[in-house]
Amino acid sequence: MSMRHLRFLRYVDEVARAGSIRKAAEQLHVTASAVNRRVMDLEEELGAPLFERRARGVRLTAAGELFVRYIREQSGDVERMKSQIEDLKGLRRGTVRIACSQALALDFLPREIAAYRAKFPLVQFDVKVFDHERAMSTLAAYEVDLVLVFRPPFLPNFQPLMSLRQRLVALMPADHPLAARSKIRLSDCVGYPVALAERSLGGRQLLAEVLARSNLRFDIVAESNSFEFLRGMVLRDKVISFQIEIGAVESDELVVRQIDDRDVPRADLVLGQLRGRSLPVPAAKFAEQLARVLEAMRP
């Protein structure tokens, strides 16, 4: 059925609503003769009158009532189809703006973006890698659509979409003395050089809270706001470093070891947006993808 034909069907619907060909023509911004002609053409095509013509207007016949019900169903289907087409147009183009913790920047987020762009190659991404405080600030300022951060600070109008409990893990060279163990205690790391994330980062803050309640003292040889630098220190200077498990990627030279839950409690990695905000279609769809992946990672 052509869109032009659907427009002519709307003439019948409008006449039925108005109860008058003249009033319907005024609503449609066409002449009464044009409306009457289209109605008569349809009646001839159907082989039955749609309206009873009366002195003070028109009234639907039984056939007309059936036909108008069909028209309205068709009109609803067309509107849904047009809405879906607009969604697809938005889905296939646009920009997803997201702020994330550093732990997500090396492997997890690039992998998920690549998977999304394999389906929608015209969608672009604007990724901000920040500590959790700054990430939430950019969300509050409408500079990004989504955040994916570890231990997000309180924001009154923040709407979590998905959260995943994360443990802190230790990164070390494959030939480190502790690498032979499947799980370590923080006390095992005492006496070995360590490189830590700076104090603005969520993982470091969690570790600092634990150390403040203990008598453990680490030999801290380097601190940085760059996880890439810390990873380089692990490989080049044989130190131990710490981060959340989702961002800890092993290699032939670098291994990841769990830290006993008795030492460091798990905390939440949270995907979220501003409450009540209608996201651009690409951002909403990407959020759905991330939520599915995070859900699948639950133990």
Describe every region a protein language model picked out.
Residues 43-60:
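A short LG(V/I)-centered, amphipathic sequence patch enriched
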Residues 93-155, 223-226:
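Central regulatory/effector-binding core of bacterial HTH transcription factors
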Residues 108, 257-299:
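A late-sequence structural motif
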